[in-house]
Amino acid sequence: MNVLLCSINTLNRFYDISALEVGQHFYWQIGDFQVHAQVLITSWVVIAILLISTILVVRNPQTIPTSGQNFFEYVLEFIRDVSKTQIGEEYGPWVPFIGTLFLFIFVSNWSGALLPWKIIKLPHGELAAPTNDINTTVALALLTSVAYFYAGISKKGLAYFGKYIQPTPILLPINILEDFTKPLSLSFRLFGNILADELVVVVLVSLVPLVIPIPVMFLGLFTSGIQALIFATLAAAYIGESMEGHH
């Protein structure tokens, strides 16, 4: 009888989880436009965290660096190394862009696990990490596409488009298709990994509270950092590729 009751309770839990509505969104109506408020709120929170922490550390730099200053210098050096490795000697102007991508994605990913978004109640839906929404990841991927087009055209002019018929004009459709697959792979890889991580934690918390979810959350933090690094590295690689003109 006890086994039967346990089985029924387990099934009820699965039923409750499956009954959760997914994809609800909270919108603000601004004129004729609908603004996705959830993404906007969480994105501005992440931006505020980055701005405030940066201002507090660098507003008064010390000759003998503080621990916070040392940390930011290490992060900057790390971003420079990634940019130089992927872009080459002309990496300098692209460090701010690559760094912004990396830091925004990194803090966004970690905010999903460390910030209590769920306690903030909305009329519809709930808050989550900005990168948990496909709108954010697609926007970042499209921004990356604009960046590597700009990098190639600004260096080579209209000759940049000659790459589409290299090494043979027969590859023109494939080379054009590649420009569509790059942002698709960037956006869906980041979105899928962050969404899957949060769903796994939610399900495990529902089934086995405070036992299994903790190591899974630590694993999620690690993979979230890796995803930020992958996105920034690929963005730098695409920019370097467009400037060099080879595949």
UniProtKB/Swiss-Prot annotation:
This is ATP synthase subunit a, chloroplastic. One of its GO terms (cellular component) is proton-transporting ATP synthase complex. It is a multi-pass membrane protein. SUPFAM superfamilies: F1F0 ATP synthase subunit A (SSF81336). The lineage of its organism: Eukaryota, Viridiplantae, Streptophyta, Embryophyta, Tracheophyta. Key component of the proton channel; it plays a direct role in the translocation of protons across the membrane. HAMAP family: ATP_synth_a_bact (MF_01393). It holds the Pfam family ATP-synt_A. Belongs to the ATPase A chain family. It is found in: Plastid, Chloroplast thylakoid membrane. Keywords: ATP synthesis, CF(0), Chloroplast, Hydrogen ion transport, Ion transport, Membrane, Plastid, Thylakoid, Transmembrane, Transmembrane helix, Transport. The chain crosses the membrane at residues 38-58, 95-115, 134-154, 199-219, 220-240. One of its GO terms (molecular function) is proton-transporting ATP synthase activity, rotational mechanism. Gene3D superfamilies: ATP synthase, F0 complex, subunit A. F-type ATPases have 2 components, CF(1) - the catalytic core - and CF(0) - the membrane proton channel. CF(1) has five subunits: alpha(3), beta(3), gamma(1), delta(1), epsilon(1). CF(0) has four main subunits: a, b, b' and c.
